[in-house]
């Protein structure tokens, strides 16, 4: 297979399909999504068998347990995948909505219309459910998509792709509106990110190495986040019970997600009241604590052992594991300075009962999501009311934070007149 010619053909077909999707009605798009859901259910056994092939190959190739877990489509995960698709049907269609329409002194009306981006390339690893999520969000937002999943999920992705094509045909939409790259050759990724004439934006989902490579090499705009080094700061005026509950959940509710807290900052004024109890809870859950000198000394005096010395690199690390960096800070100035220096710009939280300090934290912390008295684990498109999300962006232009339907669109200016001429 000539990869360059193959990817160019996918790009040409996607560009042509994107024009049909841009003019597709909401009912046609919803009909396609419903038909895809029906096809997935009809081919459930075949998809699960294909996934089992991927799992068997993964074990033979030495994939670790975490990757195998992300790769696996259990019956419950399959049902959740289809239900998530059906929830997208119920979301409001953003396309064609005109906002900010106003008369100008000349008599013309000026506003903004929500429009699709065009062709979206999505590059991801392991999880076959991303194939369904990404296809559904792109279709609902009037875009065409080229999906390049990980080689470890090739069989399940191809089985799912056939269901997507079936649903599109049933709705009278081009079955090239969603195309799954059917080669495992890594050169396909290089081609996908190198053709702005066919692809309008790339969304990479995966490990830091993949996203760095895409960001460095792409000739197409990229919506991305490199990692999720999230912080929770317990202020000196925090409610202790609330602080312990939120900080514990932010770390232990799930370890391998990008919105899990990786660094805990505690104000010096409240550290003796909150840190020993919280450290004990973390250790009971099997969390390794890496602390600054003050934190280690405080816990030793409280009779709690096991906290190891934090290195400088720990402050900027996304552990994705039961490991937590802990630092005692002088107060909110120190906390904000630390966060803005080491954070990846994903999600940060403050626990405090002081409204003024909470507002200051919201204003001065430079991340895509900033929270007050809530777990960082809430940084999620579903929790924000976006429905499903295509990913999370820590960039400051276009989409920022969880990227849902609206993040896959743009706006164009519309001008309405009645024979108006400029004098």
From Swiss-Prot:
Positions in coiled-coil regions: none
Cysteine pairings via disulfide bonds: none
EC number(s) per entry: 1.2.1.41
Keywords carried by this UniProt record: Amino-acid biosynthesis, Cytoplasm, NADP, Oxidoreductase, Proline biosynthesis
Record's subcellular location: Cytoplasm
SUPFAM superfamilies given in the database record: ALDH-like
UniProt-listed InterPro entries: Ald_DH/histidinol_DH, Ald_DH_C, Ald_DH_N, Aldehyde_DH_dom, G-glutamylP_reductase_CS, Glu-5-SA_DH, GPR_dom
Top EC group: oxidoreductase
GO CC terms: cytoplasm
GO molecular function: glutamate-5-semialdehyde dehydrogenase activity; NADP binding
One BP annotation, GO: L-proline biosynthetic process
UniProt function note: Catalyzes the NADPH-dependent reduction of L-glutamate 5-phosphate into L-glutamate 5-semialdehyde and phosphate. The product spontaneously undergoes cyclization to form 1-pyrroline-5-carboxylate.
HAMAP family: ProA
Record-given protein name: Gamma-glutamyl phosphate reductase
